[in-house]
Amino acid sequence: MSSSCSGLSRVLVAVATALVSASSPCPQAWGPPGVQYGQPGRSVKLCCPGVTAGDPVSWFRDGEPKLLQGPDSGLGHELVLAQADSTDEGTYICRTLDGALGGTVTLQLGYPPARPVVSCQAADYENFSCTWSPSQISGLPTRYLTSYRKKTVLGADSQRRSPSTGPWPCPQDPLGAARCVVHGAEFWSQYRINVTEVNPLGASTRLLDVSLQSILRPDPPQGLRVESVPGYPRRLRASWTYPASWPRQPHFLLKFRLQYRPAQHPAWSTVEPAGLEEVITDAVAGLPHAVRVSARDFLDAGTWSTWSPEAWGTPSTGTVPKEIPAWGQLHTQPEVEPQVDSPAPPRPSLQPHPRLLDHRDSVEQVAVLVSLGILSFLGLVAGALALGLWLRLRRGGKDGSPKPGFLASVIPVDRHPGAPNL
């Protein structure tokens, strides 16, 4: 693994060096033509682009008649600036021995690249993306070379089935953006990401090992809606959909968490719904409520998504619907929900208060049924054991011969004639 990694690094450094160097007497990296680069505090060499290498030239600052370096300096077509600083930046002119213009050069100072900061994230279980940023500002034109490879364990079956593990280029999307995307990744595999920062003064590489399970972070849910429940002044119904980027497959589902709060209340209440909707039963009557949701892999892989944009809803101010009893002896008036500021308590309803999406009753019923089933089973086992023991004792009483002296003290025995009286 280490040899493959070092080999990949050597290839990328070679490519970066090729980008920096050229075969002409004045290597041109990229950027505007005629621009050459150096590092502050270091010696900088400028070369005259319009002459043959080694031809003596004279150097001037643009717009200044003062000679900086004459043709007899022995440096040929090059100009040497010792310990360059910001005052040395600008345009330089080189002239041949006959005074003809050899060319113009613009000096720009900056720093070599440092290892970039790289992070990766997967919005689904098939693709992931990596982003990067420079760890220090170089002040020079910068490019990034990005690639990845699949990590394998020596002797693993997966390696025997797929000997090719890369490296492959990680396409930057869009081109030139600080982001690349890996498509068709394997959920249970690990990958090594290589991001190399290149500028005219060198190259620096960052390697990052990632696992799709650990970097999984879905996009937030979409289509969040908050609606009132007619007739229930303390209830709100929230519904949403899966994020469009998450493939709907039965083996890769999402779970959700929902937060809500009344207006002007800073604290959020949190619940974890069982599906794609939730009924809030403790809303504050008459106040608008903010609601938001986030998503996560249902097996807790990765992390929670960011929160969805907030949606707002206000509980219903209508009356609770009532039914007249079948026997018709009780005449009831329409029940009006009291206003929020009214000191009078609400009138009790004659009908049971339904609880939407409240599964506690069903859970209790299941628990009672399970308990009754266990007790019935234990009773049957005890009865079977008692019956078996009784049958065994009865069979033993019929087949076995009585032991000597058994019941002798209870049953009298007639004396034979002539037997002496003891």
Swiss-Prot record:
<dbReference type="InterPro" id="IPR036179">
    <property type="entry name" value="Ig-like_dom_sf"/>
</dbReference>
<dbReference type="GO" id="GO:0060322">
    <property type="term" value="P:head development"/>
</dbReference>
<dbReference type="InterPro" id="IPR036116">
    <property type="entry name" value="FN3_sf"/>
</dbReference>
<feature type="topological domain" description="Extracellular">
    <location>
        <begin position="24"/>
        <end position="370"/>
    </location>
</feature>
<dbReference type="GO" id="GO:0004896">
    <property type="term" value="F:cytokine receptor activity"/>
</dbReference>
<keyword id="KW-0964">Secreted</keyword>
<dbReference type="InterPro" id="IPR003530">
    <property type="entry name" value="Hematopoietin_rcpt_L_F3_CS"/>
</dbReference>
<dbReference type="InterPro" id="IPR003599">
    <property type="entry name" value="Ig_sub"/>
</dbReference>
<keyword id="KW-0325">Glycoprotein</keyword>
<feature type="short sequence motif" description="WSXWS motif">
    <location>
        <begin position="304"/>
        <end position="308"/>
    </location>
</feature>
<dbReference type="InterPro" id="IPR007110">
    <property type="entry name" value="Ig-like_dom"/>
</dbReference>
<feature type="topological domain" description="Cytoplasmic">
    <location>
        <begin position="392"/>
        <end position="422"/>
    </location>
</feature>
<protein>
    <recommendedName>
        <fullName>Interleukin-11 receptor subunit alpha</fullName>
    </recommendedName>
</protein>
<feature type="region of interest" description="Disordered">
    <location>
        <begin position="335"/>
        <end position="355"/>
    </location>
</feature>
<keyword id="KW-1015">Disulfide bond</keyword>
<keyword id="KW-0677">Repeat</keyword>
<feature type="glycosylation site" description="N-linked (GlcNAc...) asparagine">
    <location>
        <position position="194"/>
    </location>
</feature>
<comment type="similarity">
    <text>Belongs to the type I cytokine receptor family. Type 3 subfamily.</text>
</comment>
<dbReference type="InterPro" id="IPR003961">
    <property type="entry name" value="FN3_dom"/>
</dbReference>
<keyword id="KW-1133">Transmembrane helix</keyword>
<feature type="domain" description="Ig-like C2-type">
    <location>
        <begin position="27"/>
        <end position="110"/>
    </location>
</feature>
<keyword id="KW-0812">Transmembrane</keyword>
<feature type="domain" description="Fibronectin type-III 1">
    <location>
        <begin position="112"/>
        <end position="219"/>
    </location>
</feature>
<comment type="subunit">
    <text>On IL11 binding, forms a multimer complex with IL6ST/gp130.</text>
</comment>
<dbReference type="InterPro" id="IPR013783">
    <property type="entry name" value="Ig-like_fold"/>
</dbReference>
<keyword id="KW-0472">Membrane</keyword>
<dbReference type="InterPro" id="IPR053073">
    <property type="entry name" value="IL11/IL27_subunit_beta"/>
</dbReference>
<dbReference type="GO" id="GO:0032502">
    <property type="term" value="P:developmental process"/>
</dbReference>
<feature type="domain" description="Fibronectin type-III 2">
    <location>
        <begin position="220"/>
        <end position="317"/>
    </location>
</feature>
<feature type="signal peptide">
    <location>
        <begin position="1"/>
        <end position="22"/>
    </location>
</feature>
<feature type="disulfide bond">
    <location>
        <begin position="120"/>
        <end position="130"/>
    </location>
</feature>
<dbReference type="GO" id="GO:0016020">
    <property type="term" value="C:membrane"/>
</dbReference>
<feature type="disulfide bond">
    <location>
        <begin position="48"/>
        <end position="94"/>
    </location>
</feature>
<feature type="transmembrane region" description="Helical">
    <location>
        <begin position="371"/>
        <end position="391"/>
    </location>
</feature>
<keyword id="KW-0732">Signal</keyword>
<keyword id="KW-0675">Receptor</keyword>
<feature type="disulfide bond">
    <location>
        <begin position="170"/>
        <end position="180"/>
    </location>
</feature>
<comment type="function">
    <text>Receptor for interleukin-11 (IL11). The receptor systems for IL6, LIF, OSM, CNTF, IL11 and CT1 can utilize IL6ST for initiating signal transmission. The IL11/IL11RA/IL6ST complex may be involved in the control of proliferation and/or differentiation of skeletogenic progenitor or other mesenchymal cells. Essential for the normal development of craniofacial bones and teeth. Restricts suture fusion and tooth number.</text>
</comment>
<feature type="glycosylation site" description="N-linked (GlcNAc...) asparagine">
    <location>
        <position position="127"/>
    </location>
</feature>
<dbReference type="GO" id="GO:0005576">
    <property type="term" value="C:extracellular region"/>
</dbReference>
<keyword id="KW-0393">Immunoglobulin domain</keyword>
